[in-house]
From Swiss-Prot:
Part of the multisubunit axonemal dynein complex formed at least of two heavy chains and a number of intermediate and light chains. Associated with axonemal dynein subunits such as, DNAH2, DNAI3, and DYNLT1. Interacts with DYNLT1. Plays a critical role in the assembly of axonemal dynein complex, thereby playing a role in ciliary motility. This is Dynein axonemal intermediate chain 4. PANTHER family: DYNEIN AXONEMAL INTERMEDIATE CHAIN 4, DYNEIN INTERMEDIATE CHAIN. WD repeats lie at residues 492-532, 541-589, 616-656, 660-700, 703-742, 748-787. InterPro entries: Dynein_IC, WD40/YVTN_repeat-like_dom_sf, WD40_repeat_dom_sf, WD40_rpt. Keywords: Cell projection, Cilium, Cytoplasm, Cytoskeleton, Flagellum, Repeat, WD repeat. It comes from Rattus norvegicus (Rat). Residues 143-155 have a biased composition (Low complexity). The gene is Dnai4. Residues 1-33 have a biased composition (Polar residues). The keyword Transport does not apply. The keyword Repeat applies.
Length: 803
């Protein structure tokens, strides 16, 4: 292949050896050829062009110094100071800046084949795909190598061999200051193994509200698609009903596990307020302001009557509105004064006392027939309204009957005989009058009843459970016959009340025994709920439930005129104690109940029967009863089923022991007419009548298979007593029968009778149950007591056994 022409300015042989000068060539040839250098174009004529370009060697150091020593242009001011402007651009001395050349520009405004030859400077072969968009212009420029291409090659050689470019580059090296990065220190092995602490901190949580819209404007591009989609959905819903293409299927979804959260808030305080307006309040509030307003209005109108006709109607309207404002101000002031007075009135003690008596009057009107039957008074029927003439006729007839009273005396005697015969045919029964109960006593067990010694209309009731595991809150209430709907006094306690009793010498004192062993004394005259005295801090307090408390008057001297009152209590800890009121409650033990061994007689020889070892030497006490005449003697019932006769003078031994019951003795009471006879009941379902001179019972009654909780003698007959079983109340009359009770009253399902008590002055019986109710029953058609001595009658009934 012939060599390409070289530049005319420098006649340098391009084929010289490599050691003489550095050579770089750009050749175009067939890429498949291994010996030659060339380029295969995309032209159909397959014209091959070969060029060889030679670059000048690098400049010598002497030339560099000459170029650097060349002084640049300096600007001096009149004083001779160098004010030459500093260059804004400082090129990197280590970077090889691109030489401004004409490689990428064509002489004729378009790129030719010479550009392609320079592009393959460091490549032996060039793929046509690398030419890109320039392939078309290069191939389509000409099919043969023209003179213009030769001239272009010559210009390229001039640009490559132009020493001015290198001089400019060396000159820029002298003015540029290079800042090199400091060399990084080598990391040792210890530094690599060192623990590095990394602290992770939570960034602030940013919340962005994003609510995608569900509406699209009708002018938007998506409006047509949305409208079409909605129309298709409506058509789908219409075609779904009755279509065979749709089938209903059941799906099961998983609900997330619920999470409970506790929220605590302040206590909400509720207050109830009531307002009462009576007719006279309304009358005063409307009439008094109107009178004052009328006087002021008349005075005001009299002064302005001369100018009314000449005034504008607007002025008249303003005057009427001002009068209305004055009236409203006066009414508001009067209401404020009434509110201030009403608060004082509602908080006054006088109002509370008046309301207390008013409530009693209303209750007596409501319960008038029942109260009349309780007091054994005639019952008056209410007169029907609208018949005053008939009432007057009745009154006149009553007066006429009183005049003819003498004439009818003989007739009355005959009628009495007939009435007695009729009463003998009608059996005795119980009629319920009312019950003492309220919301506070609902569900509580009535444990004890006691009448006030001075006021027979006042009744004390204790509420508490007998079982140890059934303990709830306790309460002691004072009820009055005049108000059966709400108690007069309420003494609440966290412990159950087991016994209550009023004092004899001081009727205002109420003794209360609790299940925790405390004995408390309340003053019923005051409204305070705190006890006057109690044994909660006494070192000698009971350690078990106090099953009974009773006030006893004991003789001090031999004559019996001087008496003092003591409070006696019996507890499950086996102690019978007396309490004396001094500065506090002083306790003294009357008896320590001890367990006794069972003895049996065989062939006249008494032998002690061996029993099991006793867990406790103390016998729990359940009840006691002091003799009606000799207050130094008393009976004590125990949990063993024994009844001990004790004396206040001996506290170590018993006077007598009565054996008959097989279970705990719940109640012992003396006959009020025969002081030697007493009555007892037990958990062994039995009721027994005893004589104090005989250790065996005279009568034993086992009418049912239920526990007998309480018994009581009648205050009007020595033969009659009442017993409270679990499911019924029995009235016994020993004069009529000793086998069957005279009256039986069965309890409601789920209710147990617990206590009984006779009224003092009337033929009524009070029965307490397990639901917190104290029912009052009237004894009707009871047999009249005999006229003979009642004390002798019971002795005659007992027969020779009592002697």
């Amino acid at each position: 292949m012939p060599s390409s022409p070289t530049s005319t300015r420098k006649q340098t042989n391009f084929t010289a050896s490599v050691s003489a000068q550095s050579r770089k060539s750009i050749s175009f040839g067939n890429p498949k050829s291994t010996g030659g250098k060339g380029y295969a174009g995309a032209n159909q004529s397959k014209i091959v062009a070969s060029r060889t370009m030679t670059f000048l060697p690098e400049m010598k150091p002497a030339e560099k110094l000459n170029i650097a020593s060349a002084k640049l242009v300096q600007v001096l001011d009149p004083r001779g100071v160098d004010v030459t402007p500093r260059p804004l651009y400082h090129p990197d001395p280590h970077a090889m800046p691109t030489k401004p050349s004409k490689l990428l520009t064509s002489q004729e405004g378009s790129m030719g084949s010479d550009y392609i030859s320079s592009y393959s400077l460091y490549q032996n072969t060039l793929n046509p795909s690398m030419l890109g968009q320039y392939t078309r212009s290069v191939i389509g420029s000409s099919s043969t190598v023209s003179k213009s291409s030769i001239s272009t090659t010559e210009s390229m050689t001039e640009d490559l061999e132009d020493p001015s470019y290198k001089r400019d580059r060396l000159a820029s090296f002298a003015d540029v200051r290079v800042m090199r990065a400091p060399a990084e220190a080598a990391i040792t092995k210890e530094e690599l193994e060192r623990n590095v602490e990394i602290f992770l901190m939570e960034t602030e949580t940013l919340r962005f509200f994003d609510l995608p819209t569900v509406m699209i404007s009708t002018d938007s591009e998506e409006a047509e698609k949305v409208i079409e989609k909605n129309i298709n959905y409506e058509i789908l819903c219409r075609n779904r009903l009755g279509n065979d293409l749709y089938v209903e299927r059941m799906m099961q979804t998983f609900n997330g596990a619920p999470k409970n959260k506790d929220v605590q808030c302040d206590k909400i305080i509720m207050e109830e307020k009531g307002v009462m307006a009576t007719t006279w309040d309304l009358y005063d509030s409307f009439n008094i302001p109107e009178a004052s307003l009328a006087a002021k209005r008349s005075a005001y109108l009299s002064k302005a009557s001369l100018l009314v006709r000449d005034r504008d109607p607007k002025i008249q309207d303003s005057e009427s509105s001002s009068l209305m404002d004055i009236e409203s101000v006066i009414l508001a002031k009067s209401h404020e004064d009434e509110e201030d007075n009403s608060e004082k009135i509602l908080k006054s003690d006088k109002l509370h006392q008046d309301l207390f008596y008013m409530e009693r009057v209303l209750m007596e009107n409501v319960f008038q027939p029942k109260l009349a039957a309780y007091r054994q008074l005639p019952i008056y029927k209410e007169l029907e309204p609208g018949q005053p003439e008939e009432d007057l006729q009745v009154v006149n007839k009553v007066t006429e009957d009183e005049v003819k009273k003498d004439e009818e005396e003989e007739m009355e005697t005959e009628l009495e005989i007939e009435i007695t015969t009729e009463q003998s045919t009608i059996p005795a029964n119980l009629e319920r009058l009312w019950s003492f109960s309220c919301d506070l006593t609902k569900g509580l067990n009535v444990s004890s009843l006691s009448w006030n010694k001075a006021n027979s209309d006042l009744l004390a009731v204790g509420y508490g459970n007998f079982g140890f595991k059934e303990q709830k809150r306790g309460m002691a209430c004072c009820w009055s016959i005049k108000n059966p709907m709400w108690p007069e006094r309420i003494y609440q306690s966290p412990y159950g009340v087991t016994s209550v009793d009023f004092s004899i010498s001081s009727p205002n004192l109420l003794a209360v025994g609790y299940h925790n062993g405390t004995v408390a004394i309340y003053n019923v005259q005051s409204n305070h709920n705190t006890p006057v005295l109690d044994s909660s801090e006494s070192p000698q307090k009971h350690l078990g439930p106090v099953w009974q408390v009773q006030w006893i008057e004991q003789d001090r001297g031999t004559t019996g005129d001087d008496r003092r009152e003591i409070l006696v209590s019996i507890s499950a800890d086996g102690r019978i104690s007396k309490w004396v009121i001094r500065k506090g409650l002083d306790c003294h033990d009357l008896m320590h109940l001890k367990r006794t061994t069972v003895t049996s007689s065989k062939k006249g020889i008494e032998k002690e029967k061996k029993g099991e070892a006793l867990i406790s030497r103390q016998a729990p006490g359940m009840c006691f009863a002091f003799h009606t005449k000799d207050t130094n003697i008393y009976l004590a019932g125990t949990e063993e089923g024994l009844i001990h006769k004790c004396s206040c003078s001996y506290n170590e031994q018993y006077l007598e022991t009565y054996r008959g019951h097989k279970g705990p003795v719940y109640k012992v009471t003396w006959n009020p007419f025969c002081p030697d006879v007493f009555l007892s009941c037990s958990a062994d379902w039995g009721v027994m009548i005893w004589h104090q001179d005989n250790v065996k019972p005279f009568f034993t009654f086992y009418p049912t298979t239920y526990v007998v909780y309480d018994v009581a003698w009648s205050p009007k007959s020595a033969y009659i007593f009442a017993a409270a079983n679990e499911n019924r109340v029995e009235i016994w009359d020993l004069q009529i029968s000793t086998l069957d009770p005279l009256i039986v009253n069965v309890a409601n399902p789920g209710i147990k009778f617990t206590t009984v008590l006779f009224a003092k002055q009337t033929d009524c019986l009070l029965v307490g149950d397990s639901d917190g109710q104290v029912a009052v029953y009237e004894l009707r058609n009871m047999p009249t007591p005999t006229e003979s001595g009642r004390g002798d009658v019971i002795n005659v009934l007992l027969g020779p056994k009592a002697n």
